[in-house]
């Protein structure tokens, strides 16, 4: 596969801003148009650094909302490999254990790769790998309420720990890194992942890039 045959779309924004929802919607609709074997989704979360050498007490102190917590270099390497026609083994990250597992998920080359993650647009090298980028501009208080519900229900967190993390790292890192990265987005999406007009615009852009 030649690099021009692979379109990479990056969807960034605060945690619980609607990134996964719009990525899922675009994935499902493009699968109907292009086939399920032609579209891939990569979550930035999979590239949290391995912390197997640290104790659990040390792992929970990691600032997961800082760019240094993520191995963007590996993500860039994987994107370049996919563009060159090579399959890659994506890490599997455990939210309960705060480190990578021994498992890998193999992703084969696709016509469209959809990236989604909070810090995608903070990395210049990663931005260069994207053909188009999106920032989900959802109010932070709404994101917090969604995150609180999600992390308690799906990730085994206590309400107190989620609130403490939000105060100590999530909100400060959003203001320091994530919100400023909005300037690099090609499309800014208000009102979350259910914004139908924004979804249609992004799909049209992807189809235009594929037609080149």
Curated annotation (Swiss-Prot):
Pathway: Pyrimidine metabolism; CTP biosynthesis via salvage pathway; CTP from cytidine: step 1/3; Pyrimidine metabolism; UMP biosynthesis via salvage pathway; UMP from uridine: step 1/1. It comes from the Bacteria. Keywords: ATP-binding, Cytoplasm, Kinase, Nucleotide-binding, Transferase. ATP binds at residues 13-20. One of its GO terms (biological process) is CTP salvage. It is an enzyme of class 2 (transferase). The keyword Cytoplasm applies. It catalyses: uridine + ATP = UMP + ADP + H(+); cytidine + ATP = CMP + ADP + H(+). InterPro entries: P-loop_NTPase, PRK/URK, Uridine_kinase, Uridine_kinase-like. One of its GO terms (molecular function) is cytidine kinase activity. Its main location: cytoplasm. GO terms for cellular component: cytoplasm. It is found in: Cytoplasm. Its EC number is 2.7.1.48. Belongs to the uridine kinase family. This is Uridine kinase. It comes from Shewanella halifaxensis (strain HAW-EB4). The gene is udk.
